[in-house]
């Protein structure tokens, strides 16, 4: 997180995180990740290190899982000689939501072995309060599995709110 203040772009940040992770992890251990940069141009730039594609919920309720243009290895495996991920742009407009999550969410199974249908649960994200929306999604995941998921199940919800134009100053 600290490196984000020092690196001029997302690729540089990703390279720095890769070096740090490679130093910290031993052997064949690795970490998947998605790095995201949200600007004022109604786009999010994503850098995907072998992680599940984020879920983008459009204003009309439609869902997209924007995949990277090419597969990239997870963080910590740069010694295998492959290039890092290519950044890719995804439209992200006011009123839309971007859900970043770990594979523990989508790989959570019910008693019959069915995976959690994340793309079918967007109605739970209509809750105006983002914290409550995530809590409803988490509760639904626990209900699906019949208890806490067996793997980590982290989620981060980003909502794009309209920017308020500054009003006239006192005068």
Segment roles from a protein language model:
Residues 1-171:
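Conserved subregion of the PPM/PP2C metallophosphatase catalytic domain
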